[in-house]
């Protein structure tokens, strides 16, 4: 005996008269368009924000540009533990550690510090895993959300650009 070919018979769905002419679908689409038109033109509830003049209010959970925090004495919190670099799924963080010498001991609480700390915003997916992984609370995604620029070099954040200013507010937790 040989192999038997199995044929599956498919019956076509009979379209009704309104399905054939797509009147129902066209009417449904026009109704949605009419609702948006009434909201925008008659009720004056626009969805668009006039950007340069009006700024959008972001929620407290918004993940903006990366910032690095200082402790209460104004020292850098980052101790080059590499937790943020290892957990980053986009591999956007690069850290070079350095030993703390006595001349800069007042700037760093531990025995090593981040000599070079860079975040490539072109690779970053703003997932917030670096913020969660940091045991010292040094990195936060609470900076501005406006990151438009003309050059690619401006989208590579260095430690100096991310570091919180000395004397600024000390924020230890996301508010």
From Swiss-Prot:
Function according to Swiss-Prot or TrEMBL: NDH-1 shuttles electrons from NADH, via FMN and iron-sulfur (Fe-S) centers, to quinones in the respiratory chain. The immediate electron acceptor for the enzyme in this species is believed to be ubiquinone. Couples the redox reaction to proton translocation (for every two electrons transferred, four hydrogen ions are translocated across the cytoplasmic membrane), and thus conserves the redox energy in a proton gradient.
Gene: nuoI
Subunit structure, as described in the record: NDH-1 is composed of 14 different subunits. Subunits NuoA, H, J, K, L, M, N constitute the membrane sector of the complex.
Enzyme Commission number, as recorded: 7.1.1.-
Reactions this protein catalyses: a quinone + NADH + 5 H(+)(in) = a quinol + NAD(+) + 4 H(+)(out)
4Fe-4S ferredoxin-type domain ranges (all copies): 69-98, 115-144
NCBIfam families: NuoI (TIGR01971)
Cofactor note: Binds 2 [4Fe-4S] clusters per subunit.
Sequence positions that bind [4Fe-4S] cluster 2: 88, 124, 127, 130
GO cellular component: plasma membrane
Binding site for [4Fe-4S] cluster 1: 78, 81, 84, 134
Disulfide bonds: none
PANTHER family xrefs: NADH DEHYDROGENASE [UBIQUINONE] IRON-SULFUR PROTEIN 8, MITOCHONDRIAL (PTHR10849:SF20), NADH DEHYDROGENASE UBIQUINONE IRON-SULFUR PROTEIN 8, MITOCHONDRIAL (PTHR10849)
Protein name per UniProt: NADH-quinone oxidoreductase subunit I
Topology with respect to the bilayer: Peripheral membrane protein
């Amino acid at each position: 005996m040989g192999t038997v070919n199995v044929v599956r018979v498919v019956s076509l769905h009979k379209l009704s008269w309104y399905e054939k002419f797509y009147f129902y679908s066209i009417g449904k689409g026009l109704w949605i368009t009419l609702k948006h038109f009434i909201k925008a033109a008659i009720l004056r509830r626009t969805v668009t924000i006039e950007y340069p003049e009006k700024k959008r209010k972001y929620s407290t959970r918004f993940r903006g540009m990366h910032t690095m925090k200082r402790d209460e004495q104004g020292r850098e919190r980052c101790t080059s533990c590499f937790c943020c670099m290892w957990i980053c799924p986009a591999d956007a963080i690069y850290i070079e550690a350095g030993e703390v010498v006595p001349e800069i001991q007042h700037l760093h609480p531990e025995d090593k510090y981040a000599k070079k700390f860079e975040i490539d915003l072109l690779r970053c997916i703003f997932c917030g895993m670096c913020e969660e992984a940091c045991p010292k609370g040094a990195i936060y995604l609470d900076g501005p959300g406006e990151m438009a620029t003309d050059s690619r070099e401006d989208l590579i954040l260095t430690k100096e650009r991310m570091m919180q200013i000395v004397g600024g507010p000390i924020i230890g937790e996301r508010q």
